[in-house]
Amino acid sequence: MRIVDVAETTKPIASPIRNAYIDFTKMTTSLVAVVTDVVRDGRRVVGYGFNSNGRYGQGGLIRERFRNRILEAEPRSLLDDQRTNLDPHRIWAAMMANEKPGGHGERSVAVGTLDMAIWDAVAKIAGKPLFRLLAEKKGRRPIRVSSSMRRVVITTRARIIRRSRPRCAVISAAATMWSR
């Protein structure tokens, strides 16, 4: 079991909408496909991800740094302990090799886009919807989510966390946080 390709394409959102901060008419988004050699129901398993609007596509970072690190890693080093699925945490460690610690906004968009595609592939290999796969993980972890543009209200397993006017923007891969 291994990742055989990571494909990225940058596409325009081309939407005539805008808000108080952003005009989306020239905004782009990255679309990512993490292609594996696993076959389910006669079809190759491919995980898909995209970055949200409000940030531009990050094709350069994905294609020039992160894709290469994933594909150059020893395939077995990216598998879980049972060798039955990909391990998103090990893949994340491989793609972040030689990166300076810290958030660094545009990089987090690229990594989050890949993270989404990796988790999609993991769920497909497991034969489960992603929400079920994540729900099987034991324990709770606090998640910090904030935004500089709006008030954030997050429902976390029947607990509501409210933050009024957070000071910094943090992009976090919730799937990774829940599964640890």
Regions found by a protein language model. Name each.
Residues 139-180:
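Metal-dependent enolase-superfamily TIM-barrel catalytic cores that perform enediolate-based chemistry
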Residues 39-126:
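Metal- or metallocofactor-binding catalytic centers and their adjacent structured scaffolds
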Residues 16-19, 117, 164:
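Short alpha-helical segments and helix-capping/turn motifs at coil-helix boundaries
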Residues 1-59:
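Structured beta-strand/loop patches that form or line metal/cofactor-binding pockets in enzymes
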Residues 108-132, 139, 146-147, 151-152, ...:
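Conserved structural scaffold segments of CAZyme catalytic domains across common CAZy folds
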Residues 26-28, 63, 142:
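A short, structural micro-pattern
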Residues 1-8, 19-23, 93-95, 99-102, ...:
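N-terminal amphipathic alpha-helix/helix-capping segment at the start of soluble metabolic enzymes
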